[in-house]
């Protein structure tokens, strides 16, 4: 048999009277009670002066009760919707007489009390529908049994309720200043500076206050409860159990919820396909694009790492650190500034151009070939880390590649064509490169390179005064120059990386570091290997060896540096 809510209220009535001291409250007893979570967990009783959290299933109303014993009692009720709009109403029902009509002093039977309340509808004091934090405040409320009924018609949702009969002394929510707006004081491409007036709760009432700033791209929020619900929306741990999947339908029917007749009858029955589908829904749900930052008691904050030309919504919440209850300022929104339009560099046919790109930066180049109907060749020499190159012709993307070292791209020509080159730098640091665009195939300033530009050292051929190394060549006859430099034994890969600018040629080296230069090529690409013994070294010393290959146009490319060490004892 399903219990009537009024019947539940009468059963809970002694608990209400015992757990609440209305209108006067025993503070020591109250503090002990609100610390006892078991007392208020999943209870229909609203404790006086404490905020409770609840959960609503869609279209299933929930009712809460509290008793005011004396007339002319101040009353304040605050309802905070979280992730969905709520409909709620507050009604007043007069308390039944405790004594029977004969004046025997014996209480009326429970069934008669229940019938007396059910027959009387009660008086509706307030109702609201929406997602705002809404208040019911009365300076003089009559005695009686108060019922708060809440329902969510949109979806399952969280909510919070706070009620007190001493609103003048109980001020757990921070008070807003006379101007509760959040102002944008500075706006950049990736930063926004916000400012707001401090809450009087901190300056006047000397209560511990901290501010939390929330940033997102969708809309402003009216409560931290709504923010946290949004942030936890993709968390499988927060998912509400569903009838027929997590529980037997009987479990829900027992508690007054409608069950799905098509749900599995076995508590543990769940088809594997459904299970894997549910798991995919949980694991593939995208992360919510929202950020919450608590900044202490400062009332100025700069939000950084934003995207240019993007609209963001900003909310500020004052949080009472003693009660962990919060109040929302009037949020704002702003669009970050656009990226500064970069100057497009014009490439000259057959001329090498040096390009510098900031970390994560982008550069645009334009090329109008002299002979537009001829094939067009782009030669790129990335000096440091890999860079990204995209080439478009008349708006159409022709190529998109990552370039490390030297790469060459050849495109079919088109009359009166114009090319737009987009270069994107490395995430690790600044990028440097040399680029040549030409419609004249014989204009190739960079030498051809093998796929592997490492230098190999032969450990067994090491002596106290020499090392033997080898490197790959190509079918094209090129000039190779070898340089050596003594380094400390603790010379690390990080040191080597700082000197790995492949665009620096032999002209930047000391004459004393030069070992030799020689020409080399092989018609058989599989045999294009050359070896060299570096002599005149000191025993037990470390050296950095570099090999430069010289191009016909005078531009050189450096192979990957190699650290070698001579034997200490021979």
Swiss-Prot record:
Pfam families found in the cross-reference section: NDNF, NDNF_C, NDNF_N
Protein name in UniProt: Protein NDNF
Alphabetical GO biological process terms: cellular response to fibroblast growth factor stimulus; extracellular matrix organization; gonadotrophin-releasing hormone neuronal migration to the hypothalamus; negative regulation of neuron apoptotic process; neuron migration; positive regulation of cell-substrate adhesion; positive regulation of neuron projection development
GO MF annotation terms: glycosaminoglycan binding; heparin binding
Transmembrane segments: none
Function: Secretory protein that plays a role in various cellular processes. Acts as a chemorepellent acting on gonadotropin-releasing hormone (GnRH) expressing neurons regulating their migration to the hypothalamus. Also promotes neuron migration, growth and survival as well as neurite outgrowth and is involved in the development of the olfactory system. May also act through the regulation of growth factors activity and downstream signaling. Also regulates extracellular matrix assembly and cell adhesiveness.
Domain (Fibronectin type-III) ranges: 261-333, 447-566
GO cellular component annotations of the record: extracellular matrix; extracellular region
Main location class: secreted
